[in-house]
Amino acid sequence: RSYGIADRVTVMRAGEVQGVSETKNTSITELASQMVGREVFLQVKKDEANPKDEILNVENLWVHDARGLLAVNGVEMSIKEGEIVGIAGVEGNGQTELVEALTGLRKASRGKIMYLGEDIASSTPKNIRRKKIAHIPEDRTNTGLNTQLSIWENLIGNSYFRKPLSSKGIFNLKKVAKHANKLKEDFDIRSPNVSLKVKSLSGGNQQKVVVARELSEDPTLTIASQPTRGVDIGNIEAIHEQLVQMRDDGGAVLLVSAELDEVMAVADRVGVMYEGQIVKWVNPKEVDQSQMGLYMAGVTE
């Protein structure tokens, strides 16, 4: 936003000024490189998807919101291994309730959620997690993290109960520390150590903790809701690369984002949600943003 409004832009990184530029003489790519300290690719690099067997099939799904109002109205969709399916739309059109139903956080009123042939519509979040379904929630503070716990405790939230991190309910603290520190380095979580409470981190680094925990578990299906919210541009690039790599390794990814650019760049197919329904399926390579804007407003003809 600064780029479009300001005459001059000062870039700071790690507490130091990296450069002062006239916006009329500087590209967004140059500013991004100064922000990160290396070359940044703003376009997502990926090959054509090669979808195979169906992982998730949602049939006639109805979901009510916390007020008892219908938020998801007869949604049908499928996701195959080896593809990224995106959901686009103005926030408040049922995306939140759809994700909550898929992850067991909200009970569906009607319909089926078939995961590898099993209906998980009535499953608890705990059981869904144990089926190798990862979830990056849109609200990291209230849903994605326990801010009263340490960084390492949040990082092992999906794996604390199994080997090699624990055996018969007893932590192997050496292996826990090794695991947490590896994720800290791999995902560039900026903190002196993993023993600090996660609430001491910036919002962007808190998001990195969530992403690190979810993407490090080799999930079969990843449900990513606003996965890059509050993250710096270099780590946005890294998260996009990780989602594409998961696809290329045979995983299935559902990407829900309020950032239209993100959905269009990362997803292989995009469903547009409007008033609780998926009103249009598109190939992001075959539509432009003006067309998407009309679809997001409910204009499909």
Question: What feature does the model see in each segment?
Answer:
Residues 1-301:
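Glycine-rich phosphate-binding loops of nucleotide-dependent enzymes
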